[in-house]
């Protein structure tokens, strides 16, 4: 099987991380792949904010948990969080940001790094506190949170994929 196809099929969402640091060169490759995601009319509306500082990750985790209505860590102890935003003035901003998220996760897997898409970025960064954080990052109110891509190395064996349910491909017959 083609290596790229195999990578797409074997990627899994990981929700338990060790403290092992992702080497800078590996993280740079993942982020570079994210920046090359397709975008509508090549507008490249998405922006990635990379968090490696434990305190900053904890701050954003707390806000995310608050939106979710829990006090558990929605980032599962991951040592890196990439918050993806996109400019809502671009008609395809949600799709653009989503493709960045996909590229980040697939590139991470190709390099032996685990990942998971964590939702609620839109809700977190719609709050007054979230908007203040965005301002500190140089993002104005036109940017909308698309997702949080957590990255790191699993502290448990990663399970194999569950079988696909089927019926998700329909061929038109003439």
Regions found by a protein language model. Give the residues of each.
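Acidic, surface-exposed loops and disordered segments
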Residues: 1-174
């Amino acid at each position: 099987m083609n290596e790229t196809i195999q990578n797409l099929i074997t990627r899994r969402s990981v929700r338990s991380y060790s403290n092992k640091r992702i080497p800078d060169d590996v993280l740079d490759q993942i982020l570079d792949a994210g920046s090359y995601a397709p975008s509508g009319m090549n507008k490249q509306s998405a922006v990635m904010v990379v968090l490696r500082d434990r305190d900053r990750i904890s701050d954003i985790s707390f806000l995310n948990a608050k939106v979710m209505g829990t006090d558990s860590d929605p980032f599962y102890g991951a040592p890196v969080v990439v918050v993806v935003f996109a400019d809502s003035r671009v008609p395809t901003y949600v799709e653009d940001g989503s493709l960045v998220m996909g590229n980040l996760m697939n590139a991470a897997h190709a390099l032996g790094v685990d990942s998971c898409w964590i939702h609620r970025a839109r809700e977190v960064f719609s709050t007054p506190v979230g908007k203040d954080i965005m301002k500190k990052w140089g993002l104005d109110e036109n940017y909308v949170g698309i997702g949080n891509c957590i990255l790191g190395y699993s502290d448990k064996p990663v399970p194999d994929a569950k079988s696909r349910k089927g019926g998700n491909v329909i061929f038109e017959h003439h």
